[in-house]
Amino acid sequence: MNYELLLDKSLQIGHDLLVNGAEISRVDDTLAHIYKAYGINEINIFTITCSIVVTIKTPENKIYTQSIRVFKSTTNLDRVERLNALSRYICKNKPSIEYISKQIDKIRKRPMYNDKIICLTYGMIAFTLVIYFNGTFADAIVAGLIGIILKIALNFVSKIDNNAPVINVLVSFIAGILAVFAVKFNFGQNLDIIVISNIMLLIPGVALTNALRDMIKGDTMSGTNRLIETILIAV
């Protein structure tokens, strides 16, 4: 068994779990179960929102340490589920490193939803939120169109900068300016409802939930880091 390669591939699984919205405890448990499946009992895992460090001691008393950085995060629960399924398969069947590598690549190459569908979804959510907040139908139409533009701007700005708070500030500014002009030229009536409905699209609900779960489970450092990051993004 090449434990160094096992460590490398398992860290890729942990990295992808963390990037796609899994909580810290899920990452730790997944890695620990994988190592135990291959006969490794001395395991030390340190995971925070931006890094994973793992040290293992093999049955031959050799020690290996690797780390991996996490530079960005998103929400892709389909990928999280597939990575969880892969980790369960690994624990049950102990496949070769080559098999694990191929499955990781397969999951990474799995296409996400089409950008056009995601943009339309942003518009539909903004439209629905206006109705929920008792806005007019005209407000809903305006908010829906701004929601589509917001997602397009989000995709564009994300290619320039990975800093989530900065991205949200820029995109929120664009959405606010569009809402002001829409109301000024009588395309909409309630500026506050239009703006709130679009800003709601940027609130990181999954990240906030994971931060609280991490803190409840005792991962205070990771939970606090993620909570602060979430608050900065939301503000």
Task: Walk through the language-model features, giving the residues of each.
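Soluble N-terminal domains of membrane-associated systems
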Residues: 1-99
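Loop-to-transmembrane-helix entry motif
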Residues: 107-114, 160, 231-234
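Alpha-solenoid HEAT/Armadillo repeat architecture
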Residues: 18, 131-134, 217
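C-terminal ends of transmembrane helices
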Residues: 106, 150-161, 207-222
